[in-house]
Each structure stands twice: as C-alpha cells, then as structure tokens.
C-alpha cells in the first residue's frame, strides 16, 4: 500500500507543471493587446515609451532593459502588469 501511494505521489509530481512562468503583454504601440509567457528565468515585465517623428511609441515585453536617455522604462513583477 505504501509503495502504491509513493508511486502515485511521484507520478503526480512528474505530471504536474510545478514551475511558474511570468506572463507579460508584448504588443507594440497601437497593436491589438497580446501576451507571452516569459522564459523560465525572467522575473520582470517592461513597458518602454519614447517619442519620435510619429508621436509616442510603446514597446512591451519580458525582462527589464537598461535605462536609456529620453526613453521611459517601467519594470514590474506580476502577470500582465505592463499594460
């Protein structure tokens, strides 16, 4: 009986996805909102905003890019927080 319970426990652990994947928005500027699952090590979502000859541009995705001049970057750590 103990062997059966142990076997069921092992099968359950193997079959379940115990990992957590952060989900971030990844659309650009005026595109329809979409999301993506980030790679295993990613713990941040970002929203990058800047102005060019077409007006304000927005980029979203996984990770947290380094700071750049004249570009507003917001990083966050919860699912779909970069809307």
Swiss-Prot record:
InterPro entries: Snake_3FTx, Snake_toxin-like_sf, Snake_toxin_con_site, Toxin_cobra-type
SUPFAM superfamilies given in the database record: Snake toxin-like
Tissue: Expressed by the venom gland.
Keywords annotated in UniProt: Acetylcholine receptor inhibiting toxin, Disulfide bond, Ion channel impairing toxin, Neurotoxin, Postsynaptic neurotoxin, Secreted, Signal, Toxin
GO molecular function: acetylcholine receptor inhibitor activity; ion channel regulator activity; toxin activity
PROSITE patterns assigned to the protein according to its UniProt record, in alphabetical order: SNAKE_TOXIN (PS00272)
Cysteines paired by S-S bonds: 24-45, 38-62, 64-75, 76-81
Record entry for activity regulation: In vitro, its neurotoxicity is neutralized by both the specific Chinese N.atra monovalent antivenom and, interestingly, the Australian polyvalent snake antivenom.
Record's keyword annotation contains Signal: yes
Pfam entry (one): Toxin_cobra-type
GO cellular component: extracellular region
Leader sequence residues: 1-21
Gene3D superfamilies tied to this protein: CD59 (2.10.60.10)
Entry's localization field: Secreted
Note: Accounts for approximately 9% of N.atra crude venom.
Role, per record: Strong post-synaptic neurotoxin that probably binds to muscle nicotinic acetylcholine receptor (nAChR) and inhibits acetylcholine from binding to the receptor, thereby impairing neuromuscular transmission. Abolishes in vitro indirect twitches in a concentration- and time-dependent manner and abolishes contractile responses to exogenous acetylcholine and carbachol. Its inhibitory effects on nerve-mediated twitches are not reversed by repeat washing, suggesting relatively strong binding of the toxin at the skeletal nAChR.
Family named by the database record: Belongs to the three-finger toxin family. Short-chain subfamily. Type I alpha-neurotoxin sub-subfamily.
Protein name: Alpha-elapitoxin-Na1a
Species whose genome carries this gene: Naja atra
Source lineage: Eukaryota, Metazoa, Chordata, Craniata, Vertebrata
